[in-house]
Amino acid sequence: MTNLRKTHPLIKIXNHSFIDLPXPSFISTXXNFGSLLGVCLVLQIITGLFLAMHYTADTTTAFSSVTHICRDVNYGWLIRYAHANGASMFFIFLYFHIGRGLYYGSYTFMETWNIGVILLFTVMATAFMGYVLPWGQMSFWGATVITNLLSAIPYIGPTLVEWIWGGFSVDKATLTRFFAFHFILPFIITAMVMIHLLFLHESGSNNPSGLNSDSDKIPFHPYYTIKDILGLLLMSLTLLMLILFSPDLLGDPDNYSPANPLNTPPHIKPEWYFLFAYAILRSIPNKLGGVLTLVLSILILMMFPVLHTAKQRSMTFRPMSQCLLWILVANLIILTWIGGQPVEYPFITIGQLASISYFCIILILMPITSLMENHLLKW
């Protein structure tokens, strides 16, 4: 009798994706982040669903409904903090996953890479809208500032902003539609993740050497399922430590004050995972220029396949490029720090220098370094 998992139309798909999938025999731990992102997405959808059962998307009751979840709902505090800190874990893994892609040259899988960048934009939009929902001070003012950026678009800007707000300011209509979008987007993200995997399985996985590994493949199960479970255990431990010991470590104290349109917080800033982009936005004195630079700072990821001048795919055997990539990582950490600082003398200059160096490293230094390495290797 033939095996059901190999013949059943539905189970067959799962079998070809997670069980009998031929994978390179020597991919590093860095390749674990994809599966962890999948787990994070499922966690976010489940916790979000339970939160939505108790949350009310109305300006008068949104803040108190979140308080009610934390105080009165069975394990509501756990669900709420798992959702909030789960989002932080999601972004940590997203950035690691992108970094891994840059290090090993995975961006040469054009379709997989491009849908990945679109996924990043979608996840960022979802996280931003989720941050607005508790209707605290930072939620309200964050929503006001970020949506207001669209007014920089010539001609249609102001009309577009009012259309998104559903009025002349961030109010009940804005909160209701943000809740609707925040609810539907994770399911769209799930569909896009499936397309992401579909494109990946068309070409097969990359590996640290960057060479073709068709001659040396092993089944995904049990080798990589066990490896993924190890990553899952480490993630669960970290997330539980965060939720149970310091749930508000990555949050903003201002969000424990209900939204007040008459009182602006001294420093408006988004969640920590957007700070690098926020720092780039603030470092440009012009509004439209800042918005364009903000979009380009993420969109530039799509340029990597075009900017790849090296004869080798991976950075494993390219020490100079490795060095530059780590400088880029340090630069992004500096930008994240600057994004959380007030707009004052030393921070403005540091932010501007870090923003310029961010674009210079990617657009100029990395391609030139790759060409130099080609020359040194006599290629």
From Swiss-Prot:
Pfam families xrefs: Cytochrom_B_C (PF00032), Cytochrome_B (PF00033)
Keyword Plastid: no
InterPro entries in alphabetical order: Cyt_b/b6_C (IPR005798), Cyt_b/b6_C_sf (IPR036150), Cyt_b/b6_N (IPR005797), Cytb/b6-like_sf (IPR027387), Cytochrome_b (IPR030689), Cytochrome_b_C_euk/bac (IPR048260), Cytochrome_b_N_euk/bac (IPR048259), Di-haem_cyt_TM (IPR016174)
Binding site for heme b b562: 83, 182
Cofactor note: Binds 2 heme b groups non-covalently.
Example GO molecular function: metal ion binding
Cofactor: heme b
Binding site for heme b b566: 97, 196
Membrane topology of the entry: Multi-pass membrane protein
Annotated GO CC locations: mitochondrial inner membrane; respiratory chain complex III
Signal sequence interval, chain numbering: none
Location in the cell: Mitochondrion inner membrane
RNA-binding is among the record's keywords: no
Family membership noted in the UniProt record: Belongs to the cytochrome b family.
Function: Component of the ubiquinol-cytochrome c reductase complex (complex III or cytochrome b-c1 complex) that is part of the mitochondrial respiratory chain. The b-c1 complex mediates electron transfer from ubiquinol to cytochrome c. Contributes to the generation of a proton gradient across the mitochondrial membrane that is then used for ATP synthesis.
Other observations noted: Heme 1 (or BL or b562) is low-potential and absorbs at about 562 nm, and heme 2 (or BH or b566) is high-potential and absorbs at about 566 nm.
Protein name stated in the entry: Cytochrome b
Underlying gene: MT-CYB
